[in-house]
């Protein structure tokens, strides 16, 4: 084998090893986004919920700042229960539809049903809860104790 071929092979192996350490992206995040859009009839973009209060977005701690933030805490807790059942909620794909009455789930497995129900409950909660701009992108180190 030529030295150049060995270098290419080595580079491919190293890049594959590095890629294996990258955690997978949440696959159902897109589905959750669509459920939110369906529930609130497009009145607020889904990304507005990604960094809201103490629980909407990555992580979560302290006391929820308002009703909308409580929706996110309940959603986090629901995912925690799904994990206890042996499900992987951030990776679980499910079937859902956006009907005239809003979103609904149509899934087959227990994990799909449970995770879709978690997302559906949160999406409907978001739709009925007031959005307070002052709770977007807050300093969680100070307000979420």
Swiss-Prot record:
Residues 22-27 form a propeptide. Its EC number is 3.1.1.4. GO terms for molecular function: calcium ion binding; calcium-dependent phospholipase A2 activity; phospholipid binding. Keywords: Calcium, Disulfide bond, Hydrolase, Lipid degradation, Lipid metabolism, Metal-binding, Secreted, Signal. One of its GO terms (biological process) is phospholipid metabolic process. The keyword Hydrolase applies. The active site is at 75, 119. Disulfide bonds join 38-98, 54-144, 56-72, 71-125, 78-118, 87-111, 105-116. Residues 1-21 form the signal peptide. It is found in: Secreted. It holds the Pfam family Phospholip_A2_1. Ca(2+) binds at residues 55, 57, 59, 76. Binds 1 Ca(2+) ion. Belongs to the phospholipase A2 family. Group I subfamily. D49 sub-subfamily. This is Basic phospholipase A2 cL038. It comes from Laticauda semifasciata (Black-banded sea krait).
């Amino acid at each position: 084998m030529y030295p150049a071929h060995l270098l290419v092979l080595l580079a491919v192996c190293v890049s594959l090893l590095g890629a294996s350490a990258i955690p997978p992206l949440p696959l159902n995040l897109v589905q959750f986004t669509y459920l939110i859009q369906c529930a609130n009839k497009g009145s607020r973009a889904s990304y507005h919920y990604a960094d809201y209060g103490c629980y909407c977005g990555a992580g979560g701690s302290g006391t929820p700042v308002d009703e909308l933030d409580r929706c996110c805490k309940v959603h986090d807790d629901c995912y925690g229960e799904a994990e206890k059942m042996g499900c992987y909620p951030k990776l679980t794909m499910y079937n859902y539809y956006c009907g005239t009455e809003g979103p609904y789930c149509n899934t087959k497995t227990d994990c799909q049903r449970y995770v879709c129900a978690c997302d559906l409950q949160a999406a409907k909660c978001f739709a009925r809860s007031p959005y307070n701009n002052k709770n977007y992108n807050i300093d969680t180190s100070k307000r979420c104790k």
